[in-house]
């Protein structure tokens, strides 16, 4: 088990060595020095500040120290795997990981890092003492030490089951969790893609198996004797292997699998080896399952005996103090874990007297007594921000390619676990969390500044010729395609544009990095100062702000500050559409449909609407459905038209005017189409509406 912990720590520190400078280095996204300065402002006292962020980096925040600390952690992890001074190695692993985890804020998922911190701390007294202790037969861990580690495993299992039942997320209770788990996990594998395609009944069986592994297995381990522990070990291991092969949750499942070996003892392993015909292994394990006899004590004279008794007496006192101190520390840790267990059970822990809750708050930032709620909640969709740059004023855009997480729709989902892509996973998590994260625009700023550490987190530099002057942050929704689509197109993912996460960043004429801000232009527009508004919009459009260009086209369309100029509006909309502005692409379709500034052409109208609809534009879906209902869709296809209307209606859930309009008008067009279609065609349209395109 200790070797497994060491292997996981090797993966952790290798990741920190690779990504640490980009994340928290002096020139990184969230520099340690800035973070610790903020902690110092909030907690002026030295001791208070340390307990607010327990870290070696109070000694310094330079790139050399960050690298040195990370490499020392890797060396300690290697020593643990090689069984060299395991207690010291565990202490170094815990100290180094805590130093990073307590200072890099959003780059530390609580479940992953917290589990490894708690495991390392509890393994300290479990590991045998000495530089080369072998299997530690001469100094086996005490019963309370073994109990605390098994208590950790049982909490990981049982709390994860319990939180699924009491969580506000209904997916586990209504047996639909596995219908969404694979698709919404940060980086599913190709096996996750195929698991997603299984029928709902298979997903229900997977849910039942999950609860057996997390709820029944710990009870069997506690009350079922050795057979119960074998059962718990096997189903728990199968669950962790299955999740790791389908979902890529970093080292989480590897660590949970390693902890599962705590359910076994040498006698159980010896018996299993014997039944499997592994005689040598069986004899070896049986030998070490029994404590060796102590060597005989040589005869001594009275003087030396008295001296020995004195020395032994002092040693016994120290041993007792150490033993009682360890028991007290483990008892405190056990008490702290009860707070987290109570929270999972939704008990009112915060209502307890401060004298009881104070220790838990005091040690909270050490993150070594935790609650575990694995896979309790699900995001409504797989959402991700892509960084796109332009070096020609927004005429063309190039995407910064990620290394691991889904982005290219035709890329086979890879196997990356136990490696944890901390940078990419953080971007994905922050893409959908309210309020909008400050991490994402900081990454965009570093890309404009050509920070080599941050740029190295991407698979390649899309601007080897000339650096970008604008970087935008475009949010997309991703959904798995079905096998038929995969065979036809080679696409594993369907990707829809959602919105711009924040206004784009650009390099000003003075060489500074700034965020596009249309406040002044919009204020002038609302005040009726159309000439001023036009000039401000035009300036930002020339810098690459497509939103400013859309305002310009809208002013031409409505005749604000001059006559209505549909030709100029269409030219602007067409230019914006070519640059990837989805609203403008819809308006190009509108112009072709109604002959606004261009000759009417229903074929080109449908083409533009389809391109916008493929990127998730609700109004374009609705427009295509209306064309079908009014017999103007080219080519004619009532099944597709009804599917467009149904998809538009499903998307019209917001409070904005466009959503309200679709909700009001869509039913009449649906009725009109459905009345002239056969029942089979209507069923086909409904199925098509539910299929990612």
Listing of model-derived features with the role each one plays in the protein:
Residues 525-531, 565-566, 601-602:
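Helix-turn-helix repeat elements of alpha-solenoid scaffolds
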Residues 525-529, 542-546, 558-560, 578-581, ...:
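Short helix-capping/linker turns of helical repeat alpha-solenoids
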Residues 517-524, 536, 549-558, 572, ...:
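Hydrophobic face of amphipathic alpha-helices that form TPR/SEL1-like repeat modules
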Residues 636-656, 687-690:
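TPR/TPR-like (Sel1-like) alpha-helical repeat modules
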Residues 1-517:
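Alpha-helical membrane-anchoring segments
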Residues 657-693:
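Terminal, low-structured helical/coil segments at or just beyond the last alpha-helical repeat
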């Amino acid at each position: 088990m200790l070797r497994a912990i060491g292997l996981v720590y090797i993966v952790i520190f290798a990741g920190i060595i690779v990504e640490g400078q980009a994340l928290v280095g002096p020139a990184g996204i969230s520099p340690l020095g800035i973070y610790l300065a903020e902690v110092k402002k909030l907690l002026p006292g030295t001791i208070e500040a340390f307990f607010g962020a327990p870290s070696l980096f109070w000694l310094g925040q330079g790139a050399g120290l960050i690298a040195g600390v990370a490499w020392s952690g890797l060396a300690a992890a290697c020593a643990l795997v090689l069984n060299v001074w395991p207690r010291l190695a565990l202490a170094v692993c815990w100290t180094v990981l805590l130093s990073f985890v307590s200072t890099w804020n959003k780059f530390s998922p609580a479940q992953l890092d917290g589990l490894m911190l708690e495991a390392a701390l509890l393994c300290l007294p479990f590991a045998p003492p000495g530089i080369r202790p072998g299997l530690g037969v001469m100094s086996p861990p005490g019963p309370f030490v073994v109990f605390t580690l098994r208590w950790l495993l049982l909490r990981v299992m049982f709390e994860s089951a319990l939180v699924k039942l009491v969580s506000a997320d209904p997916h586990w209770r209504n047996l639909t969790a596995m219908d969404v788990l694979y698709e919404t996990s940060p980086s599913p594998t190709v096996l996750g893609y195929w698991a997603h395609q299984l029928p709902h009944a298979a997903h229900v069986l997977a849910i039942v198996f999950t609860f057996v592994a997390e709820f029944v297995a710990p009870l069997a381990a506690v009350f079922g004797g050795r057979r119960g522990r074998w059962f718990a070990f096997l189903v728990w291991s199968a669950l962790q292997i299955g999740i790791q092969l389908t979902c890529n949750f970093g080292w989480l499942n590897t660590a949970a699998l390693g902890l599962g070996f705590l359910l076994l003892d040498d006698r159980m392993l010896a018996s299993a080896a014997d039944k499997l015909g592994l005689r040598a292994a069986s004899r070896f394990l049986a030998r070490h399952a029994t404590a060796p006899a102590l060597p005989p004590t040589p005869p001594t004279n009275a003087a030396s005996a008295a001296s020995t008794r004195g020395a032994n007496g002092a040693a016994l006192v120290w041993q007792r103090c150490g033993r009682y101190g360890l028991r007290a520390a483990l008892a405190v840790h056990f008490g702290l874990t009860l707070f987290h267990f109570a929270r999972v059970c939704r008990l009112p822990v915060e209502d307890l007297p401060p004298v009881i809750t104070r220790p838990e708050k005091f040690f909270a930032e050490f993150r070594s007594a935790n609650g575990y709620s694995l896979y309790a909640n699900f995001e409504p969709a797989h959402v991700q921000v892509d960084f796109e740059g332009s070096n020609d004023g927004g005429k063309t855009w190039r995407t910064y390619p990620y290394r691991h997480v889904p982005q290219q729709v035709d890329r086979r989902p890879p196997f990356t676990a136990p490696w944890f892509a901390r940078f990419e996973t953080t971007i994905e998590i922050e893409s959908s969390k309210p309020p909008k994260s400050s991490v994402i625009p900081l990454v965009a700023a570093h890309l404009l500044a050509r920070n080599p550490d941050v740029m190295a987190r991407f698979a390649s530099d899309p601007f080897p010729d000339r650096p970008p002057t604008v970087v935008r942050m475009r949010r997309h929704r991703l959904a798995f395609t079905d096998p038929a689509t995969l065979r036809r197109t080679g696409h594993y993912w369907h990707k829809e544009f959602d919105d711009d996460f924040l206004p784009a960043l650009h390099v000003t004429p003075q060489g500074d990095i700034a965020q596009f801000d249309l406040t002044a232009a919009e204020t002038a527009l609302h005040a009726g100062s159309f000439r001023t508004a036009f000039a401000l919009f035009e300036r930002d459009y020339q810098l690459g702000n497509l939103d400013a260009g859309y305002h310009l086209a809208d002013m031409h369309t409505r005749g604000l500050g001059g006559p209505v100029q549909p030709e100029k509006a269409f030219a602007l909309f067409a230019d914006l559409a070519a640059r990837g502005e989805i609203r403008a692409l819809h308006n190009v379709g509108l112009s072709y449909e109604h002959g606004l500034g261009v000759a009417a052409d229903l074929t080109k109208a449908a083409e533009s609407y389809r391109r916008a609809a493929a990127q998730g534009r609700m109004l374009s879906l609705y427009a295509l459905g209306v064309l079908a209902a009014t017999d103007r869709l080219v080519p004619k296809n009532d099944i597709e038209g009804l599917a467009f209307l149904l998809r538009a209606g499903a998307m019209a859930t917001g409070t904005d005017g466009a959503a309200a309009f679709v909700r009001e008008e869509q039913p009449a067009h649906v009725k009109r189409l459905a009345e002239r279609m056969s029942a089979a065609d209507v069923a086909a349209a409904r199925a098509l509406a539910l299929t990612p395109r």
